[in-house]
């Protein structure tokens, strides 16, 4: 009898538990193009700190180079601008306009304008990309890679040279944008929009 009572209690408990409505889980809303969305976000952040760096550093430091073996501050900005055309022309399936900014521009105003123009050219590649179109294969540096890989390579290149510029800025006692809490708060607010 005791075993029967325990069995009835267990069955009743199970029935009550199973009869309850399952908790409603809120599933995350899937983003239509999660890979390109993240790549675009990463690019946008790199672009923001690069432009802020170019604007923040005084023109007198544009010719600064820590050693003779490396590019000057201004040459790095020109190189990054040239690279925007290189990477993004491949991603867009266009001929590289190759403006040769690194070799032809040296003033702060000219380099900032060139950098803004180069980023505007690249913006179109990032904005027009989807996860599907990003999987299309293209040739880059002799390798067949997906278009999205080209844009990821561009992001990596921006980050690499931003790292160079951070060192140059620190050598001149300038706080880089990524270490400026007010600037980073501003960036985070724009990302959340």
Locate the predicted segments by residue:
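Bacterial Sec-dependent N-terminal signal peptides
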Residues: 1-26
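Short N-terminal segments immediately surrounding and downstream of signal-peptide cleavage
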Residues: 21-44
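Well-ordered alpha-helical scaffold segments within catalytic/enzyme domains
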Residues: 49, 53-54, 88, 118-126
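Polybasic, low-complexity association/targeting segments
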Residues: 98-106
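Surface-exposed helix-capping loop/turn segments at secondary-structure junctions
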Residues: 56-62, 126-135, 171-177
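Acidic/histidine-rich alpha-helical segments that form the ligand environment
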Residues: 106-139, 145-161
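Short, contiguous alpha-helical
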Residues: 40-44, 48-51, 61-99, 140-193
């Amino acid at each position: 009898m005791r075993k029967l009572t325990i069995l009835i209690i267990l069955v009743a408990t199970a029935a009550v538990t199973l009869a309850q409505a399952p908790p409603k889980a809120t599933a995350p809303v899937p983003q239509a193009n999660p890979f390109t969305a993240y790549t675009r976000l990463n690019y946008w952040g790199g672009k923001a700190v690069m432009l802020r760096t170019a604007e923040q550093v005084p023109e007198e430091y544009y010719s600064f180079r820590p050693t003779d073996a490396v590019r000057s501050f201004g040459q790095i900005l020109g190189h990054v601008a040239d690279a925007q055309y290189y990477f993004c022309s491949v991603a867009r399936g266009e001929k590289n306009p190759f403006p040769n900014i690194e070799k032809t521009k040296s003033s702060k105003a000219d380099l900032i304008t060139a950098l803004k123009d180069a980023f505007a050219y690249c913006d179109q590649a990032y904005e027009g990309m989807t996860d599907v179109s990003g999987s299309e294969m293209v040739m880059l540096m002799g390798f067949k890679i997906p278009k999205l890989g080209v844009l990821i390579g561009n992001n990596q290149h921006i980050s690499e040279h931003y790292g160079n510029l951070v060192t140059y800025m620190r050598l001149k006692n300038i706080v880089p944008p990524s270490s400026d809490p007010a600037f980073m708060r501003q960036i985070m607010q724009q990302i959340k929009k």
